[in-house]
Amino acid sequence: VAAETGHVACHDAGAIEFGGHKVLTIPGYEGKMHAEDLENYIQVFYENESYEHTVFPGAVYVSLSTEYGTLYSKAELAAIHAVCQKRQIPLFVDGARLAYALAADECDITLPELAQLCDVFYIGGTKCGALCGEAVVFCGMHAPAHPIPRIKQHGALLAKGRLTDVQFEALF
């Protein structure tokens, strides 16, 4: 589930669908969703008598910061995370622009706090000066079992990955 103005719904060239999934959209406001809209969407989904025959909302997607340059506040992210926890749906934070979000004067979230406000996020490297790489962070007990074979099967496991690691140590 993503905001209709969110990156994954508009600017990912169908990457989610290419992998066999579907992006379900709710109203978006400059790239952001509101917790109330998310709760209403999920409530309506379960009230539908034939919900078992429709696409199940399997994750919630937000960007920090959005392509519009907007930021989620700690309170907004906490409210969305609360809906996700209540409904047992993981919250994924797209952190392609996370370095810029965390550096913004308006941002009231720290990196450790972000880890408490979602289930998985990633830290984009290339948009903040790295030559390549993104770091996926699984929070709490949400890490998948045996991730390396899955990464390798998708052609995303870099040889000499230590070179990528060094950049993240320097940047974050």
Show where each model-derived region lies.
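Catalytic PLP-binding core of fold-type I/II PLP enzymes
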Residues: 72-104
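Active-site C-terminal subdomain of aminotransferase-like
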Residues: 56-58, 63, 71, 110-172
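Conserved PLP-anchoring active-site segment centered on the Schiff-base-forming lysine
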Residues: 1-10, 39
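Active-site-proximal loop/turn and secondary-structure-junction residues that shape catalytic pockets
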Residues: 66, 97-99, 127
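PLP-dependent aminotransferase-class I/II
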Residues: 20-58, 62-65, 72-79
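Alpha-helical scaffolding segments of alpha/beta enzyme cores, especially the outer helices
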Residues: 40, 75-86, 109, 113-116
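Active-site-proximal loop->helix
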Residues: 11-21
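Short beta->alpha connector loops at strand-helix junctions that form conserved
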Residues: 3-4, 25-29, 125, 158
